[in-house]
Amino acid sequence: PNLRHFGMVFQSYAIWPHMNVFENTAFPLQTSSVKFSKIQIKNKVEAALQTVDLSGLETREATKLSGGQQQRLALARALVTEPRLLLLDEPLSNLDAQLRERMQVELKRLQQQLSVTTVYVTHDQNEALALSHQIGIINEGRIVQIGSPRDIYEHPSNRFVADFVGETNLIEGTINSKCKQEISADKKYCYQVQTVFGSIMALTTNSCQIGKQVLISIRPQDIHLSIQKPDGDNFWKATLENILFLGEHLDVRLN
């Protein structure tokens, strides 16, 4: 593995406390099988630190850096050799919420600027959706679905993916018939599904057989509340049980 041309940022950053910022960044160049002159090392380190906005901190001790600065130093060290592949192992998990959001934007910018292929491992669904072009969902060591963030979120392949990525309401049912209404362009098939709540009109990208047992996924943001009986399909009576104020939105629990 040490001969492969890739950079890696560990979850714990692995910043060496006895080295300053310059020395930490230069270490991969100094131990590389390719020999670099002192001036080459200096230029490469300065370029890497400038990329992650750490210019001017070359002589600062690693232990004097903030959490966000340590994260950027680990990233500079991974980028200094100009790798063909960048591996990130939950690099933001040790940061507080506000800093984590800022670093998500920074990582996205750097990836686009450097055009380096990046594999990012995370348990944070928001990070995965925000940072990725392609997402691979792994369950018990097996990849269960690969797709764009939108595909993963809107078209989960099974119960695990639907329940794992974002909040959802899962309803079991049996397909009774095809819908008579016209359907939207991005959904190829429409079926009437019999459930414990009655008949539900469900859209899917997959062709299904009449009588098939299926699982309907309804995202909270696709549910609308009304005090009057609406027209059309897919509405049910419910009792409001609880409302949680979460700042930018309300979490409403219905029975």
Show which residues each predicted segment covers.
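Structural detector for hydrophobic anchor residues on beta-strands
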Residues: 134, 170-171, 200, 236
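Glycine/charge-rich catalytic "coupling/switch" loops of P-loop NTPases
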Residues: 154, 179-185, 190-244
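Short aromatic-glycine-enriched beta-strand elements
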Residues: 189-191, 249-252
